[in-house]
From Swiss-Prot:
Record has Thylakoid as a keyword: no
Keywords: Cytoplasm, Nucleus, Phosphoprotein
Domain of life: Eukaryota
Protein name, as recorded: Inclusion body clearance protein iml2
Annotated compartments: Cytoplasm; Nucleus
Keyword Cytoplasm: yes
Quaternary assembly: Interacts with lipid droplet proteins.
Cellular component terms per the entry's GO annotation: cytoplasm; nucleus
Lineage: Eukaryota, Fungi, Dikarya, Ascomycota, Pezizomycotina
Length: 645
């Protein structure tokens, strides 16, 4: 209640629209300097004043630093700053409604800019709670996210109604809007938007979460196919004419950025606990709407646009690029839920021209080259991009470089890069040391027969780093659960240790099919590999590279791993071969037979994907696989529609 009466305690200067807009300009300039790797100047500008914009800027700066490294101490610090920003923006929102000299928009109710600041602070604060590792804090975080989303959606609704009136008006020019537009929008106040929250308390959430018998529908299903028309599209020309004021642009782009991120992120969640919380708070993601809103946010020369671009490029080059089955037809570039590579390339070029010194865009350029199977080019960029004034960006770059050295079979560089990851990040030391160790395993196998002295050195290093990994498992948790790779690696190394003891050999000599290729497979490096890299993978999978091939071949799990990895490499190596169908004569297949062949393969693909989607048992990498499966199903459904099947 103190928020409501605080203004009555101490008189404060009246708000002046011009001064407030200048604060917005200053903070946007500071945040863009942050993106351009000028950390010191950005920090200096953000501490210069005490406006809501400055408070939020400081909070977002801390939040981005914490998110990039997922460091708990930084998350806690960011949460404190964001709470201050939340309180300040709420107070300013109330004040802006009363001051006649405050900014008045033709589109939004008075004080909406501060309501947006409040919602952004609420949203980012909630994410820090979700990442805290505590289920209780995560539940509170999701509830807060829901409240923030309802507020943002309310602002969107106001805006869309205004745009509909403008779009359908054939007599009123945009340059001289009639008072009726403004008065119709002013009928709804920011208080009414802010209180559009669900009638659900955090206590209700805790109670429902703790009840194991509480039923809820299965909402971890593939997203719906794209609709023919989309009510959330805005004509770019209309938007350019309507949104000319800096504060209006801040609201317009900011709402789209936040709503788009929420809808996109929650459409990808397949974790059962997360899904249960989302269902209880009444939240459902929407991948298509989320991506469309983010693309709309990229149109403007401001910080919101840059973050929307980062989100889109990260989503497409990271998550979507991680998937195997994606649209490849001529219209694929216009499909927001596939991989629109031409749009992504154009967006990257635009952002690099705006922020030429930013390490983030170089990182995305390297990811894009990896997607195009130019791993050497990606590695060159990452090596040149290895130093940033923001240590979190350096850490992400190091991680990306470590993955690239893994995919390109640079074993020495791979070991070094993963050890560097362990020094720069505390997120998953088990994974970092394990991959460093298996990099030395391949060096050992390369020299085991040809150079025994060198092999012995590599063997010792392999054993050292592999055995370092299991004791560090469980240091980081999400929703009180261990990371999937931690669980898998502990099990894997434990099996090798038991074998080594039973067979009377060193740990490295008890290892079966290449764990190096296995990690390439898990991180979808097979898809990013060219013919040379795929041939190297197949070489590493040769049975004679193992010290004890006969004993390993008696293990069903090892045999299955070998066949899976080999099959995956062969499949990608031969993906461009023409379809053979049922013809063995070598004659060209008729159009009718080719269509039948494609239909048969498409239906078979869908059947297998649906079987995977409804797999009855849980497994360690279920969450990683779920997004790939749902994206593949979306692609298959789309292709069936295009083919008329």
């Amino acid at each position: 209640m103190s928020r409501w009466f605080k203004s009555a305690v101490k008189a404060t200067p009246a708000m002046v629209a011009e001064s407030e807009e200048q604060h917005l300009r200053d903070v946007e300039a500071a945040m863009l300097k942050l993106l351009n790797d000028d950390i010191e100047e950005a920090d200096k500008l953000l501490k210069k004043h005490d406006s809501s914009y400055h408070h939020l800027g400081r909070g977002i700066s801390g939040f981005l630093s914490a998110m990039m490294g997922v460091e708990k101490d930084l998350l806690k610090e960011a949460a404190v700053i964001l709470q201050d920003a939340e309180n300040k923006s709420w107070d300013d929102m109330k004040k802006a409604q009363k001051d006649s000299t405050a900014f008045q928009s033709n589109i939004y109710p008075q004080g909406t800019e501060y309501l947006l600041c409040y919602s952004v602070a609420q949203l980012t604060s909630a994410i820090t709670a979700v990442l805290s590792g505590s289920i209780t804090e995560a539940v509170k975080g999701f509830y807060k996210l829901r409240k923030a989303y309802l507020t943002l959606d309310g602002i969107l609704e106001v805006e869309n109604k205004y745009l509909e009136k403008i779009a359908h008006s054939s007599t009123t020019s945009l340059s001289s809007r009639t008072p009726s537009h403004k008065s119709s929008m002013a009928a709804l106040t920011v208080d009414e938007i802010a209180h559009r929250t669900a009638d659900l308390s955090v206590g209700d959430l805790d109670e429902k979460m703790l009840d194991p018998n509480n039923p809820y529908p299965n909402i971890s299903r593939p997203p719906s196919p794209p609709s023919v028309t989309n009510p959330y599209d805005i004509d770019p020309e209309l938007a350019a004419r309507v949104f000319t004021n800096r504060t209006d642009i801040f609201i317009h782009s900011g709402v789209r950025l936040c709503c788009g991120l929420l809808l996109l992120v929650f459409s990808m969640i397949e974790n059962p606990i997360f899904n249960k919380i989302l269902y209880i708070v009444g939240f459902k993601g929407d991948r298509e709407r989320g991506t469309r809103l983010l693309w709309q946010a990229t149109r403007y020369q401001n910080f919101n646009s840059a973050i929307a671009a980062l989100a889109l490029l990260g989503y497409y080059n990271g998550l979507v690029g991680f998937c195997d089955i994606l649209p490849t037809d001529d219209a694929a570039d216009d499909n927001p839920t596939g991989y629109p590579k031409n749009k992504c390339q154009a967006l990257l070029v635009d952002m690099q021209s705006r922020y030429p010194h930013s390490k983030l865009w170089k990182l995305e350029e390297a990811r894009m080259l990896s997607y195009k199977q130019d791993l050497k080019g990606a590695l060159v960029i990452l090596e040149e991009n290895s130093k940033s004034k923001m240590k979190q960006i350096t850490m992400i770059n190091t991680f990306e470089m470590a993955l690239t050295t893994l995919f390109i079979h640079e074993y020495e560089k791979s070991a070094t890069a993963w050890i560097n990851c362990s020094e720069q990040s505390a997120w998953s030391p088990t994974l970092y040391f394990y991959i460093a160790g298996i990099s030395y395993v391949e060096l050992y196998r390369n020299t085991r027969l040809s150079d025994p002295a060198a092999a012995e050195v590599h063997k010792k290093k392999a054993i050292e780093f592999i055995l370092k990994a299991p004791p560090l498992a469980g240091k980081q948790k999400v929703m009180a659960k261990q990371l999937p790779f931690d669980i898998y690696i502990v099990s894997k190394v434990g099996k090798w240790e038991q074998r080594a003891k039973a067979w009377g050999v060193d740990l490295v000599d008890a290892i079966g099919p290449s764990p190096f290729v296995e990690m390439i497979y898990f991180w979808n490096g097979v898809k990013k590999s060219g013919t040379v890299e795929l041939e190297k993978c197949l070489d590493l999978l040769k049975k004679e590279r193992m010290t004890c091939p006969e004993k390993c071949n008696e293990d069903e799990e090892d045999v299955a791993i070998h066949l899976l990895l080999r099959g995956s490499c062969c499949s990608w190596r031969e993906k461009d071969l023409p379809p053979g169908g049922d013809s063995t004569s070598g004659e060209k297949m008729s159009e009718k037979k080719l269509l039948e062949y494609r239909r048969e393969k498409l239906m078979d693909c869908e059947e297998k994907l649906l079987k995977l989607h409804s797999w009855p048992q849980t497994y360690v990498f279920e969450t990683r696989m779920s997004f790939k499966i749902s994206t593949s199903l979306l692609t298959v459904k789309r292709h069936k529609g295009l083919m008329g099947f």
